[in-house]
Design a protein with these regions (language model features):
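Membrane-proximal first intracellular loop
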Residues: 2-98, 123-126
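Cytoplasm-facing ends of alpha-helical transmembrane segments in multi-pass membrane proteins
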Residues: 40-46, 95-119, 137-151, 175-191, ...
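Conserved small/polar residues in nucleotide/adenosyl-binding loops
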Residues: 318-324
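Helix-to-loop junction signature of class
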Residues: 70-78, 143-153, 217-230
């Protein structure tokens, strides 16, 4: 059950304030709760970042910190609900920040897919990260521009124009996520069908990333609906909706990757075509010998990494295995 539904009604129901930029006077208690939650998640992800030293995962603590900043701006808006700057800061941070988590989802699944034989992926794993992160960046820019337009507008028409831009940005993000989920579902079905040795090591992590991504998808659906009915529509001017369908889902998405930290499961040394750290594992070497090298140039690997086993002739090459 979303966090907001567990709070007493007098805590998460806003006082109606038609002259407020929010359409109500924001409550302190729920905003404070989310500041605390995202603050804790920021600390936890920062510790894991230093411990596992996968520096690209810096996006997770940065995202948690940005969410925290968005709710701090909301707290300030409790007593300054007619000031534009804290309102714009809140909207931009809360609308745009999940894009950072999306980049982690796309990159994580792309890297995991690279560790498996190429035949499991309908899109070459080397293209997963740049393709979906590019879509992610486009949605980031569009959402940021739309949020700034709506937040700094002086008329209802200008605010609605900003809302429309935000809807377009969130729709781009949602579209990218849905395509990504289809790619992942295809990969997951094929891997589950064959059950290669590596699946046991990465199965729970892949499911965790998928669940985390679905939380962001549900949050994005809420944002599209919110902006579709207007900046001053019933969803945007109803406070508990924000905490239930945005804050709670984003907290859950970030928390899941605390329980299943990216740095713990993905190898530190990584190459999109060939991963020496993983391929050095005996079990993985055996899997590669039996199933083919994922995303590697066969001739290059045949000359530099001959595949032999005690029970087979030592002259057997990867190219020969692929032919059979």
């Amino acid at each position: 059950m979303p966090l907001a539904f567990m709070l007493p009604p007098n805590v998460w129901l806003a006082d109606v304030a038609p002259t407020s930029l929010y359409g109500y006077q924001p409550k302190l208690a729920p905003a404070g709760i989310f500041v605390a939650l995202f603050g804790i998640l920021f600390i936890a992800h920062s510790i894991q970042l230093v411990y596992y030293r996968q520096w690209w995962v810096l996006l997770m603590p940065l995202g948690a910190l940005a969410e925290c900043g968005g709710y701090i701006a909301r707290i300030y808006g409790h007593t300054h609900d007619r000031l534009r700057d804290p309102y714009v800061a809140m909207e931009v941070l809360l609308v745009v920040t999940p894009v950072l988590f999306a980049a982690v989802h796309f990159t994580s699944i792309g890297r995991v897919a690279t560790l498996f034989p190429r035949r499991y992926s309908i899109i070459r794993p080397i293209f997963v990260m740049p393709l979906f992160v590019t879509v992610d960046v486009i949605s980031l820019v569009v959402q940021a521009v739309g949020s700034a337009m709506a937040g700094t507008s002086d008329t209802a028409d200008d605010a609605q124009s900003g809302s429309n831009v935000v809807v377009a940005g969130v729709a781009v993000q949602l579209f990218g996520y849905l395509i990504f989920d289809l790619v992942f579902a295809s990969f997951w079905w094929r891997v589950r069908k064959d059950r290669p040795p590596l699946l046991q090591k990465y199965e729970s992590f892949m499911l965790a990333v998928f669940l985390s991504s679905m939380c962001v998808v549900l949050r994005s659906i809420y944002r599209v609906a919110e902006m579709a009915v207007g900046w001053d529509g019933v969803i945007n001017t109803t406070e508990w909706c924000l905490y239930s369908f945005d804050g709670a889902f984003v907290v859950l998405a970030v928390f899941i990757l605390n329980v299943y930290p990216v740095g713990k499961y993905l190898p530190k040394k990584f190459n999109w075509k060939y991963n020496p750290e993983v391929d050095g594992d005996e079990e993985t070497r055996k899997a590669l010998w039996m199933e083919g090298i994922p995303d590697a140039d066969e001739e290059k690997m045949a000359s530099s990494q001959p595949a032999t086993m005690d029970t087979e002739p030592t002259s057997v090459s990867y190219t020969h295995l692929r032919a059979h």
